[in-house]
């Protein structure tokens, strides 16, 4: 079950961090070492132009923003990149870890960080739900919808640990929780 830490952010003491490891489940590999991170209220929902604010923060910390959209409503994972999903509008329930996995609610202002191999899927969402998707500098993402091949499993293990936390750079909790 998730572990909760308060105030992981050097910049905003209201942030609450949840972190948890997901074991391999069904056909989804998940990540063997790095936990999923959920920053509750990473940025205040009242922040003007929250999508742009998230993009600026992610870009500044070496996680270039790649797109704005919803989340796919089918189970998938990425074998070649870690992923940050910054909720700038609406709310949703996600399924993490694969079919029958953990249901996690996210809302405006939250930041979810998924290590390579972590299954995720949209279960339900408000009509206005939108996220910014970002990946560590130099990591190109793929979309995997079936059990990993030996090459994909090796790729997941080979994706390098980011040098910075997407929210707080070198001072952020990812740097401590994602140990090499």
Q: What function would you assign to each model-found segment?
A:
Residues 1-75, 175-180:
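A short, N-terminal "cap"/entry segment at the start of jelly-roll beta-barrel domains
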Residues 106-126, 135:
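Conserved metal-binding segment of the jelly-roll/cupin
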Residues 100-102, 128:
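Short, surface-exposed beta-strand-loop junctions and turns on beta-sheet-rich folds
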Residues 78-95, 113:
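Short, conserved beta-strand element in jelly-roll/cupin
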Residues 64, 70, 89-91, 99, 123-180, ...:
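Double-stranded beta-helix
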Residues 95-97, 123:
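A generic structural motif
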Residues 70-84, 99-100, 107:
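A short beta-loop-beta micro-motif enriched in histidine and acidic residues
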């Amino acid at each position: 079950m998730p572990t909760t830490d308060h105030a992981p952010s050097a910049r905003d003491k209201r942030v609450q961090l949840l972190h948890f490891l997901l074991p391999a489940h069904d056909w989804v590999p998940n990540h063997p070492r790095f936990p999923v991170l959920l920053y509750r209220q990473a940025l205040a929902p009242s922040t003007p132009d929250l999508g742009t604010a998230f993009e600026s923060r992610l870009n500044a910390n070496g996680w270039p923003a790649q797109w704005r959209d919803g989340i796919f409503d089918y189970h998938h994972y990425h074998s070649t990149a870690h992923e940050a999903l910054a909720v700038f509008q609406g709310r949703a329930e996600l399924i993490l870890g694969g079919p029958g996995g953990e249901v996690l609610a996210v809302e405006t202002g939250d930041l979810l960080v998924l290590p390579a191999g972590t299954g995720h899927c949209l279960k339900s969402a408000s009509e206005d739900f939108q996220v910014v998707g970002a990946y560590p500098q130099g990591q190109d993402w793929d979309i995997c919808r079936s059990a990993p091949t030996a090459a994909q499993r090796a790729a997941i293990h080979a994706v390098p640990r980011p040098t910075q936390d997407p929210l707080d750079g070198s001072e952020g909790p990812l740097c401590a929780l994602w140990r090499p």
